[in-house]
Each structure stands twice: as structure tokens, then as C-alpha cells.
Amino acid sequence: MRGQWSLLLGPARLCLRLLLLLGYRRRCPPLLRGLVQRWRYGKVCLRSLLYNSFGGSDTAVDAAFEPIYWLVDNVIRWCGVVFVVLVIVLTSSIVAIAYLCVLPLILQTYSVPRLCWHFFYSHWNLILIVFHYYQAITTPPGYPPQGRNDMTTVSICKKCINPKPARTHHCSICNRCVLKMDHHCPWLNNCVGHYNHRYFFSFCFFMTLGCVYCSYGSWDLFREAYAAIEKMKQLDKNKLQAVANQTYHQTPPPTFSFRERVTHKSLVYLWFLCSSVALALGALTIWHAVLISRGETSIERHINKKERQRLQAKGRVFRNHYNYGCLDNWKVFLGVDTGRHWLTRVLLPSSHLPHGNGMSWDPPPWVTAHSASVMAV
């Protein structure tokens, strides 16, 4: 491919040089001489406006894409409200279908113990989904305090021109530095940081559980509803053919009532929506679970990957200072100090604060000695 380009560019460069040489001659046509002069004048103006001895190709690319970055940041900022409303509407529609369509059907077929189990599990799951989503939206992710000189500073933010503690990154959408920033989530219209990271992951986890529960539990109802919809289509087709043939003396085929049609279509909608969300959100939840097990955020994964490659080229081994071990990483992330906290802080709604203040990252006192030794690099 490079050889083909060289074959094409060679004659083009030769023709350009000939035109430039002809432009300096007096016998050259005035039109050609004027075009050459304008070309050179344009090059001088362009270089005088854009030349920077400290810049390079990366700087030029960043400057060229800056309008696109600005457009994306502002679009995501305004679309966040739309995404939040969409999540609320879709979740409310599933809950409404479960009460109005699914519940009357299972009351006729399920036994009392089975009904009790579904009643308690579904409402427990729904409460956790609503609680964690509300907390993830309304809880600020955490920002570095302004005007403090006693905090541990790692670097200076190039956007805010303020001290930036460890694991702090600048969000171009919120236009602020965020403590332990993971990413900006448009579905929350909020940054995921130190103080709401647990709420975000818990919402993803329990929403995935709820979608799997609805999809698996409504499989039989979905099959019956889908078959009924196909039958409705066939009956409507036969009815249209009968009207076209003007067979008024024949008895019209039986049709489904409006309530039955709405119920069947709602069950199909429920199954497809829950199944698709379970697959997409389940993959995202697994991805974040892997990152939490490694003691890193989405941004730190890219940083650690580059640092790992840099040290590997020098024959050295990279160690993550914030990796205390898989189990201890989860304890720190979920705020679990005792065995009782797995129930009161994980399986039940809890608004407890995470460990630390998001600026200094000393290991908790209950972290094992092995984890502490891993930190010391």
C-alpha cells in the first residue's frame, strides 16, 4: 500500500514543483503566476497562525477535534435528564405490567407458598433497585475541597488549575474534578465517584437480578402470549378476506377482546425488554465487578495498563497500590466491616458512607497483612 502511494505522490510532487518554478519566470502566464503567489501566501498565513514549536501532530489533532468534544459533552449533559426519565418510565411500565397483567394470571395457577416467595422476593428486589438508583442520582460523587493546603496533592488539574489528590480526575461534562472518578454515567445524569460508586454498582447488580427474574419467571406466559398474538394476526387476516369475499352469511371468526390483546402484547413487551436489559446491563455489571476485584476504576484500568507495559519493557513488575486482594477490595468497596454488615449494608438499603474521604487512601485497619504487603511497592 505504501509503495502504491509513493508511485502516485511522486508525479504529483513533480508537477507541483514545475508549476512553482514556472511561477517565478517572467514568461509564465499571469494567471499561473498569481495562483502560485496566492498558494505561497496562504501557506505563510496558515503557518503564522498555527505554528507552535512546542506542538506536534497530537496537539493539532486535539485542536481539530475540540469542537466535537464540546458538542458531545454538551449533548450528554442535556440528554442525561432524558435518560433518567427513560429509566423511570421503562421501570414503571414493567412494574405496572407485573401488577395488572402477570399477577391476575399467577393468582389462578400458583400455590400459596410459591406466591409468597414471589411476593417477598420481587418487592425486596424492587425496593433495592429504587433505593440505589435514587441514591446514585442524588448523591454527589465527591469533589476536592477548594482552598485547602493540608490535603495530599499528587498533581495539578490542567482544566481547573487546582490541586488534584490521588485517584481524582476531571470530568469534562460536569466541568469539575471528581474524587475517585470512574466515569460519567448519562443514565444517572451524574458522575460515578467516591461517594456514589457503591450505589451505581448496586443498582446495576439488582436491576440485572430483577430483569433475569422477570425474564425467567415470565417465560411460559411469554410463549402463550406470543402464540396468541400470532393467532390474532391470522384471525384478523381471515376476517379481512371474508369481508373482501362478501361472505356475510358465514359466522365471523371469534376475536380476542381488547383486554386480552393488551395483556398478550404487554407480556411480550415485558419479556423482550427484560431479556435485552439483562444481557446488556449484566455484561456491564460483570465488567465493573472485575474492576472492583482488582481495586481499580475504569479510568485507572487504562492508566495501569500503560504503566504495566512501560515497566514490563524495563523488566520490572507493576503493583497496584490500591489492590488489597479480591475479598478485601469488596469489603472496602461495600463498606463491610463485620459479618453482620453483609446483611445490613448489602442485602438491605443502607446509606452508610464509604471508607476514607476520597483524598487519602490509607488501608482500613482490618485489611489483612498480605494486602498491606502488596501495597508496599
Swiss-Prot record:
It catalyses: L-cysteinyl-[protein] + hexadecanoyl-CoA = S-hexadecanoyl-L-cysteinyl-[protein] + CoA. Residues 101-116, 220-266 are lumenal. It holds the Pfam family DHHC. One of its GO terms (cellular component) is Golgi apparatus. Its EC number is 2.3.1.225. The keyword Oxidoreductase does not apply. Residues 1-79, 138-198, 288-377 are cytoplasmic. It is a multi-pass membrane protein. GO terms for molecular function: palmitoyltransferase activity; protein-cysteine S-palmitoyltransferase activity. It is an enzyme of class 2 (transferase). Its main location: endoplasmic reticulum. It comes from the Eukaryota. Keywords: Acyltransferase, Apoptosis, DNA damage, Endoplasmic reticulum, Membrane, Transferase, Transmembrane, Transmembrane helix. InterPro entries: Palmitoyltrfase_DHHC, PFA4/ZDH16/20/ERF2-like. The chain crosses the membrane at residues 80-100, 117-137, 199-219, 267-287. Interacts with ABL1. Interacts with COPS5/JAB1. The DHHC domain is required for palmitoyltransferase activity. Palmitoyl acyltransferase that mediates palmitoylation of proteins such as PLN and ZDHHC6. Required during embryonic heart development and cardiac function, possibly by mediating palmitoylation of PLN, thereby affecting PLN phosphorylation and homooligomerization. Also required for eye development. Palmitoylates ZDHHC6, affecting the quaternary assembly of ZDHHC6, its localization, stability and function. May play a role in DNA damage response. May be involved in apoptosis regulation. Involved in the proliferation of neural stem cells by regulating the FGF/ERK pathway. This is Palmitoyltransferase ZDHHC16.
